[in-house]
Amino acid sequence: NMYFAMLSKVAFEDGKIVEHWDNLQEKPTQPNPSNRTMIDGTTEVKDLAKTEENKALVKSFVTDILVNGKMEKIANYFDGDNYIQHNPQIADGLSGLGKALEYMASQGITMRFHKIHKVLGEGNFVLTVSEGTFADKPTSFYDLFRVENGKIAEHWDVMETIIPEADRKNTNGKF
């Protein structure tokens, strides 16, 4: 059996679903190095008054670090090494993220974010929908962040290879 993790976004008009987008990734059978999975973790939405502030923080992080590669700014977005990671391959903390990026580089695996398409949020949760490449393949990135005390505290993600236009069943596009 194969199991998948999926992040979805849905557009409503007059209380009815009018559009749906999702990202789908095979869910590993084992937890990540910190014993976390792609589907566990905090779920309580709070700090509703900080929604716009949290969206701005996460957009700035994705722009500075993931799109523009300004790694010298990364510590500004986290509370030291306190960072809960749900990516199947990455351990908790900035140290875990650093080790994963070093390993990918040593294997010649590149990950590049080219464009943020959407930043959606409510309270302490912010979702970014981005486009780029992973291992030289066009990829869509759905990254869900939990913000606490003005810092990124937790992260989930689902990456999906974007199929070529010639293989698509419609012209709606991924974004």
Where are the regions that the model predicts?
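C-terminal and inter-domain tail/linker signature
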Residues: 1-175
